[in-house]
Structures are given as C-alpha cells and as structure tokens.
Swiss-Prot record:
Pfam families: TnpB_IS66. Belongs to the transposase 34 family. This is Uncharacterized protein y4jC. InterPro entries: Transposase_IS66_Orf2 (IPR008878). It comes from Sinorhizobium fredii (strain NBRC 101917 / NGR234). Keywords: Plasmid. The lineage of its organism: Bacteria, Pseudomonadati, Pseudomonadota, Alphaproteobacteria, Hyphomicrobiales.
Amino acid sequence: MIGPSRGLRIMVATQPVDFRRGMNGLVALVGSALLADPYCGDIFVFRAKRCDRLRCIYWDGSGMILSTKWLESGKFIFPPVKDGALHMSPEEFSLLVAGLDWTRVKRKPVKRPTKVA
C-alpha cells in the first residue's frame, strides 16, 4: 500500500457516524462537529459503530475523494469514544487502514547528532 505523504495531516472523528451518510453529509460533519475546513487537504477518517468499517474523505485540489474500507474479519482499533477528533501520523494511519493495532506501536526516540562530519 502506498501511504500518505509525510506532511499530510490525518484527523479521526472519535464519534461513530451513520454510514448511510454520503459525501455531502460527511463534508458537513467535518465543518460542524470537527470544526475543520473539509477543503484544506487533510484526510478525515470516520468510523462505523461496529468498528469494522471506516470512511475517509480527502480534498485533492480538484475534487473530493471518498473511500470506504470494510474488514472481512476483526475490527479496526480506534481511540475511546469521546467528542472531538484525534490527530494521527501518516504511519499510524497506514497501520489503521491495514487493520493493525496502531496503539501498540511505540516509536523509539532518536538521538540527535551532536557533530557534523
């Protein structure tokens, strides 16, 4: 899978949404519930109540993209349900879409070099 670029921001809505909503409904939800601009170029991720489905919307500069993924078995790992949104790194997003538990992956701290060769 080709993952999102490093500079891309991913925002996950923590409340489940009704998946009968279409693209226009999700765009409206980004503005009202997440208080964000749906046309800013960020990826917005929404979850179903059963946690086996997710939807993403993304403005690519020429139009809105809506993608849906259903897991055949298992569930996506999402943060606890609360109001608002969670910001996620592109690496965490790639793990989420792959159906892996992205909350168990811990990044090792990297020591900054002290000298220039």
